[in-house]
């Protein structure tokens, strides 16, 4: 049987079935570049190359992440990040909002998958060409210009990469096709016939095959060298195994593959980082020791907090393992292993869920925004890297299921939301907290003495204290209760006078009982010079 397919190493792949849906604004002269006559004669995915391909003159050739353990990452879906009313968001459009992100205070941007994927309207997790950037968001030089502009503004760029699976259009799946079963054949050395775990979609890569691992490593190296990316978020790394009995448990095979990829990334660029969507707590220690970071999903407790369900809203998982049997508290993991988040692309939006209390009653909009501010404080001021999902900073309250599907296009609201005083105030609070984090890095180093009291046993108050290695202190406390109330707080010993970070006003002594509005928080510091005013 003859199989017509494209070169898996092609840097550009034309799609005769979907390219017509890409606007000339996003990708100028696309039909001219490929040729309208080819679109008429060819069918499917087509490789192309250019003998004298366009060059890009980098303005920043040697950008380096300053501190990988103090990253504040902004996860971004290009499709929905900018106005998509009349088409799709694009790389060029996203560049116009880099100042918005810089002012917010993030120092890294994580792009959801941008390697050539199935169709044009997608989250991007249906990759079929790993060396080609998807044209639905722009040209190759557009992507480079975006990364270059991020670097000029002091922001790293992390790519979300999908090596658990690929679509059946990938050449290594298509060349070994079982037409009767409509899936890849049993003699395929690259892909498994059936996935070894229940989380997979499309066709699962067989990472036990050295050819597969070399293919992945070659792709990682290409992305670093060609596009100057600063790291990767690996999708669904729990699936990197042939042993279906050890999907949820410690799996030395899987750990070995991930360490091999991390080592190769380090050899190419020892400043580049690797983050895994992993969710196997028993492996976090080994991965962290190898310099690999892992996602820490804290969506549930922060949603409970938004819904006033404080008896079960426990934030402690942000800084420690969930696995009580292993005893692997954060002290036993490499510092900075956990990349914590309140939301990612996969979870319900906290500000949508927070429209209603746990008992079903509606929470007023202004109150909900104040609770979102308190959540942000008790998220962003914890040590270790953090991730913000797009628009959480302006209280995006449209459900993940809007449009009938989690992956459907979502309405763009940034410009309108920024005109709403309460939402702008939430953005400003994020910016203030991230400025505090940037201006006081010693509070977020591995030698910080950090304590927080944030489980249900502490009622509707929540408290956080930190002492840096240089002997400075901050204290944070909030009213997470329903309505205004008095919150009693006993500040740590050793500081005579505390100062309100935002106003500079003095707080003398240890014991205080301020009357606080719902969602109100105080950030106190031990040195007047640390204050904003």
Residue positions per predicted region:
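Active-site-proximal helices and loops of the catalytic beta/alpha 8
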Residues: 113-115, 123-126, 151-153, 236-341, ...
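Conserved interdomain hinge at the start of the Helicase C-terminal
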Residues: 372-373
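Active-site regions of oxyanion-processing enzymes, predominantly non-cytosolic
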Residues: 102, 230-234, 386-392
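Substrate-binding/active-site clefts of carbohydrate-active enzymes
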Residues: 9, 19, 38, 55-68, ...
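C-terminal beta-strand-rich structural cap/linker in extracellular carbohydrate-active enzymes
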Residues: 509-533
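The feature marks proteins involved in alpha-glucan
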Residues: 1-71, 86, 520-522
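Short, polar loop/linker segments at the starts of domains and inter-domain junctions
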Residues: 84-97, 354-363, 404, 506-516
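Glycine-rich, aromatic-lined ligand/substrate-binding cores of catalytic
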Residues: 344-347, 369
